[in-house]
Amino acid sequence: MNSAPSFDDRKRVVERGYDKVAHDYARLEGETAWPRMRWLKKMLNQLEPGSSILDLGCGSGDPADIEVAKEHKVTGVDISQTQINLARQNVPTGNFIHGDAGSVEFPVASFDAVISFYTLEHIPREEHETILRRIHQWLRPDGFLLISLEAGEVDSIISEWLGVPMHFSCFDPETVKWLVNRVGFEIVETEIESQVEQGDAIPYLWLLARKQ
């Protein structure tokens, strides 16, 4: 019997996949930008100009980090070097780091907000609580967390996503909200919204929280 893929195996699938589909995914980001930008602006309206914002799983930086960089300092992390290269082109004022969201390090109280769109769903869900705790540490008092991820329980590598294998790993929305509360956040607002990707309507959980 074949053993289940290791954490590292699953992460390599994500890294290779996003390296290969970077330009196709950038187009998809443009087609599905509206919920991301609506939630992002909702959070940005509560921050002072010049705030420090971390985008965990930043992709190409378009459109979110382009918007953030208009008035704020942006740091982005992505497991795909190709995506990081695109982000550096799209947002020249940003600081973009090639790294794994599960192991990257920042000093305590480094950021006023952390955003992570469509990223946790690619990280083994066994790591989600640990990553949320680390985000809580990186945030300054009253800092914001804004995340989105697929609103369904899944843990598998699918054979075809934009033409490549891809790993998805999510808890159900109630468990995600429980974890966010458990690590020390107060949830400000949540919503499940569907968006069409490759002809399919996929529900996503959007969650805005604040560090207690």
Task: List each language-model region with its residue ranges.
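Conserved beta-strand signature within the Rossmann-like core of class I S-adenosyl-L-methionine
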Residues: 142-149
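Class I SAM-dependent methyltransferase SAM/SAH-binding core
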Residues: 54-103
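Short alpha-helix
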Residues: 168-183
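A short glycine-rich, Lys/Arg-flanked "PGG" loop and its adjoining helix->strand segment in the class I
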Residues: 129-141
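A conserved beta-strand element that flanks and buttresses the S-adenosyl-L-methionine
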Residues: 115
